[in-house]
Every structure is written in C-alpha cells, then in structure tokens.
Design a protein with these regions (language model features):
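N-terminal flexible/basic segments that precede or flank functional cores
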Residues: 1-42
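Extended, folded domain segments that form the structural surfaces/walls around functional sites
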Residues: 26, 31, 66-68, 79
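Long, contiguous binding/interaction regions
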Residues: 32, 60, 97-99
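Alpha-solenoid HEAT/Armadillo repeat architecture
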Residues: 32, 48, 71-74
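Short alpha-helical DNA-recognition segment
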Residues: 48-68
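DNA major-groove recognition helix of helix-turn-helix/homeodomain DNA-binding modules
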Residues: 78-95
Length: 99
C-alpha cells in the first residue's frame, strides 16, 4: 500500500497577524527577547501583513529598501525603525527592567 504524501508549505507569521492585538502581542514577545535581528524581521512580518508597499509609502521609504532593512539579514537604522512603527500605527514604550 502506497502512503499518501502530505503536502506542506512554509509557515508565514504574516498570514496570522490579522488584528491589532495579534500584532501587538507578537511585537511585545519579540521585543522581550531583545535580539535586534529578530525585531527587524518581526517588523518586516508585520509590514508584510499590512502591505509592504503601503507601509513603505507611509514611512517615506522605498519598498525594496524597506524589504532589505527589515529582512533577517537587515540592519535598519533606529530612525527607520521609528518611521516603520509610525507607519504601522504603533508606538514604542519603555519600562524599567527588574534586576
């Protein structure tokens, strides 16, 4: 008897970021980790979920530049991160770390 092959496709978090709450929870979890490459990639995931072209336009950046900056290999300037956060309708908050 031949086994049926199960077809799979890569999991894309951007497909699951449907609500503001989903997006906020995802970004908060990534920020807690503190890995700058992961934070950039997460912003890229969120931008893709919202529409990269629209986010690039609202941030005043080129679409290709934004893709590159927010890729796992990207290293965006902090100013770029702030522009993207604003374009996404998000803000950055700081709280004291417990030591």
């Amino acid at each position: 008897m031949k086994r049926k092959k199960t077809e799979t496709r890569p999991w894309d978090v951007a497909e699951h970021l449907k609500t503001e709450e989903d997006i906020a929870a995802y970004l908060e979890a990534v920020l807690e980790d503190g890995d700058s490459a992961l934070i950039s990639a997460a912003l890229g995931d969120i931008a893709r979920a919202r529409g990269m072209t629209e986010i690039a336009r609202e941030a005043g950046l080129g679409r290709e530049s934004l893709y590159k900056a927010l890729s796992p290999e990207g290293n965006p300037e902090f100013a770029t991160v702030l522009k993207v956060l604003r374009a996404l309708g998000l803000t950055l908050h700081v709280k004291a770390a417990h030591r």
